[in-house]
């Protein structure tokens, strides 16, 4: 299994000058360092690809032993195009991908890795306008996933997996996305084409996407509790 970490964006909402994945947590490690440590434990460093863009040198100098793909249109494209750049380097393997600003417990990864189908990590928390939301078909698989889903069952937290048999179709739909589309648009297109995507409920695990200073404060409080 390969891993793609999406770390190309500017992250202006957090109000910092460095790439958001390098944001330091309360324990002194960066968001990206925490991700890489956990991913290496389960899947190995050689299987990790990081998509970089904004101030790419800072990330590459911090983690010189990783494989990198540069999205030179990082300032005019969104996660659909960054993910496609990474997947174009991968042939015939399952792929786990995640946003580079998600802080999570290590054990959460096993839930995704061990799922036998393409899947996404979700919770059943209340959601606001900015969160990526989801709902389900009657069979329990993902139906819709976007910021505009209403009513929504919870949040899609930005950690996902595509299995080998779905990879070609998913890549094709990423190619159909507009530059400013999130990768979830390609998931919706693939679901419309018949791809089955399972929700993996991670509500019992620590998992938070860091978009704003308040998120950083909240995750710092959670980490104080030893998670």
Give the ranges of each region predicted by the language model.
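Short beta-strand/turn micro-motifs composed of small residues
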Residues: 7, 26, 52, 99, ...
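Short glycine-enriched, charge-decorated loop/helix-capping segments at active-site entrances
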Residues: 18-24, 73
